[in-house]
Swiss-Prot record:
Localization of this protein: Cytoplasm
Protein name: Uridylate kinase
Domain of life: Bacteria
Example of a GO MF term: ATP binding
Length: 251
């Protein structure tokens, strides 16, 4: 947990009092497209503003972004493409999203580094955990692109693994719904929001929040996950401040 007396980054003020000192924020790529293929600059700018507010509060923020606004390997496989090749295409999509978010964060005055699991030295650093931690300690945002660098692994699993390796306090899983429900709220009007639940229960009940590999990894290593609605402005700050939003998943 964060020291409540911690000074905001670069002398900038913030009304947030972070409950977590280091967080891993998982963003779905579909949100970056505003429901379309490609990037919606207005959406990326809005997310960057929210992250900047959190960084100014003194919290350390790392980010993993999906690539679903460009490619989804599993869906391309269903159309006849080789799964491994389509997954690599999806990884490149995550890098495009990462560079876009980096650009908008820099415009907010937040120093940002992109680290990729696939080497592409002209646009990003290679993924080096100790270097990532050092960037975070200096108040920089670190965005992890290209997933795990391996096919068959989702960006949800990447988020869980990166959170564990950099010593994050929590995975903040941003979604287009308010949290974990007993059923899909877009299909079942009687679905109820769960305020708290265990990793095991999510897996056993087959609740579609993230893939089972990500939840198993977090469960085995005691990593909490907060599932919340990114579409509500200011929710990233509320999540970092420890406010009662979304669903907290613990062991």
């Amino acid at each position: 947990m964060a020291d409540p007396t911690a000074e905001p980054v670069a002398g900038q003020s913030s009304l947030i009092r972070p409950a977590y000192s280091r967080v891993l924020l998982k963003l779905g790529g579909e949100m970056f497209g505003g429901g379309q293929v490609g990037l919606d600059p207005d959406v990326v700018a809005q997310v960057a503003r929210q992250i900047a507010e959190v960084v100014r509060s003194g919290a350390q923020v790392a980010v993993v972004i999906g690539g679903g606004n460009f490619f989804r390997g599993a869906q391309l496989q269903q159309r006849g493409m080789d799964r491994a090749r389509s997954d690599y295409m999806g990884m490149l999509g995550t890098v495009m999203n990462s560079l876009a978010l980096q650009d908008f964060l820099q415009k907010e005055g937040i120093d940002t580094r992109v680290q990729t699991a696939i080497t592409m030295g002209q646009v990003a650093e290679p993924y080096i955990p100790l270097r990532a931690v050092r960037h975070l300690e200096k108040g920089r945002v670190v965005i992890f692109g290209a997933g795990m660098g391996l096919p068959y692994f989702s960006t949800d699993t990447t988020a869980a693994q990166r959170a564990l390796e950099i010593g994050a306090d929590v995975v903040l899983m941003a979604k287009a719904v308010d949290g974990v429900f007993t059923a899909d709220p877009r299909v079942d009007p009687d679905a109820e929001l769960l305020i708290a639940i265990s990793h095991r229960e999510v897996i056993d009940r087959g609740l579609k929040v993230a893939d089972a590999t990500a939840f198993s990894l977090c469960m085995d290593n005691g990593m909490p996950i907060l599932v919340f609605n990114l579409l509500v402005d200011g929710n990233i700050a509320r999540a970092v401040a420890g406010e009662k939003i979304g669903t907290l998943v613990t062991t």
